A protein has these predicted regions:
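A solvent-exposed interaction/effector surface
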Residues: 2-169
Length: 169
């Protein structure tokens, strides 16, 4: 399993099970930290409250049903935003938004269920750390601390949003 942990800020091959959304950069190499630019994108999102370690499992069916009903191709990554977390928080968040990203932000869904929402995100700059291994909470916390340390060492950047994980496979 491989994923990125990122904060929005003002030659190993990855076998991905699906395509990246239009204009998305490739995943950050494992253990590397990189500043990246993402284009604007559209996503279908499921909001979850509870043990955030369960968020992706609980969100899968509603998100999959949405893309299936609307005949939208599956992409990678799956995005998880910890909406009640901050750049300096050390406690486990209790709210998450899990999103399937549309292949192209121009896709207009015809059928949106009451359990999901469709959101357009603007372009953003992030600092990203590449991670390879299990999607464990301890790995998230370890790599979050590394990103926080990187931000402290690079005062020209400031975290302006909640952390997000991009899960590639």
């Amino acid at each position: 399993l491989r994923y990125n942990l990122e904060f929005k800020i003002s030659d190993e091959k990855l076998l991905m099970s699906a395509s990246l959304p239009k204009g998305f950069p490739k995943p950050t190499e494992p253990e590397a930290i990189a500043v990246k630019d993402y284009p604007g994108y559209r996503a279908v999102t499921y909001s979850y409250q509870g043990q955030v370690q369960q968020a992706t499992r609980v969100a899968f069916d509603p998100l999959y049903n949405h893309i299936s009903r609307n005949q939208i191709a599956m992409t990678t990554p799956v995005e998880v935003r910890y909406t009640d977390a901050s750049a300096i928080q050390v406690e486990t968040p209790s709210q998450a938004e899990v999103s399937f990203l549309y292949p192209d932000r121009e896709i207009e869904p015809q059928n949106i269920g009451s359990d999901v929402k469709v959101t357009d995100y603007p372009p953003m700059k992030v600092v990203s750390i590449g991670i390879q291994g299990a999607y464990s909470w301890s790995s998230y916390e370890t790599h979050l601390q590394r990103l926080q340390g990187w931000l402290q060492a690079h005062p020209e950047y400031k975290a302006v949003g909640c952390p997000r994980r991009l899960l590639y496979n």
